[in-house]
């Protein structure tokens, strides 16, 4: 138990262009070394590409991609009697969002397109359609949880 008082969570302000808090959080995930302007340029560029390629509302595509990439369960290590068990646990909503955003970013970075906004646009489109690196990561985490279902009685 911490001795100090609990520090309140800081609210993230919605982004100026679309008024979305989720998008603002994603910009913070993409940001490197505090360069917010660069992160904004990348994310807005990616959304412009998405709109150009699909003709759909880019925020809807973004929301669908995030929703598809969110994990439902994950495994946590639990030591019981000298053995480590991978125990499947449900993921809290805030962590679901954070993991989905992180996985989208990492999958985009590993892609082959020239610039980051093109990579991110490609990954968002793939995730919205249920494929791509972020979806592969989510399925891998779900498979691990499914394989270790027998240890679910060791819940935390």
UniProtKB/Swiss-Prot annotation:
One record GO biological process: translation
GO cellular-component term (any): small ribosomal subunit
UniProt keyword Ribosomal protein, yes or no: yes
GO molecular function term, any single one: rRNA binding
Cross-referenced CDD domains: uS7_Bacteria (cd14869)
Superkingdom, natural source: Bacteria
Name of a matching Pfam family: Ribosomal_S7
Alphabetized UniProt keyword annotations: Ribonucleoprotein, Ribosomal protein, RNA-binding, rRNA-binding, tRNA-binding
Subunit structure of this chain's protein: Part of the 30S ribosomal subunit. Contacts proteins S9 and S11.
Similarity remark: Belongs to the universal ribosomal protein uS7 family.
Reported function: One of the primary rRNA binding proteins, it binds directly to 16S rRNA where it nucleates assembly of the head domain of the 30S subunit. Is located at the subunit interface close to the decoding center, probably blocks exit of the E-site tRNA.
Protein name, per record: Small ribosomal subunit protein uS7
The species this protein was found in: Laribacter hongkongensis (strain HLHK9)
């Amino acid at each position: 138990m911490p001795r100090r008082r609990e520090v309140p969570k800081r609210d993230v302000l919605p982004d100026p262009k679309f008024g979305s808090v989720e998008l603002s959080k994603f910009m913070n995930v993409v940001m490197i070394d505090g360069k917010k302007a660069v992160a904004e340029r990348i994310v807005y560029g990616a959304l412009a590409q998405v709109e150009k390629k699909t003709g759909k509302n880019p925020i809807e595509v973004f929301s669908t991609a995030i929703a598809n990439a969110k994990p439902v369960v994950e495994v946590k290590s639990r030591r019981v009697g000298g053995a480590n068990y991978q125990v499947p646990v449900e993921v809290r909503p805030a962590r679901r969002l954070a993991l989905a955003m992180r996985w989208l970013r990492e999958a985009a970075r590993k892609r082959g397109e020239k610039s980051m906004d093109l990579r991110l646009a490609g990954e968002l489109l793939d995730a919205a359609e249920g494929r791509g690196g972020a979806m592969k990561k989510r399925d891998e985490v779900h498979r691990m949880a499914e394989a270790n279902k027998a240890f679910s009685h060791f819940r935390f």
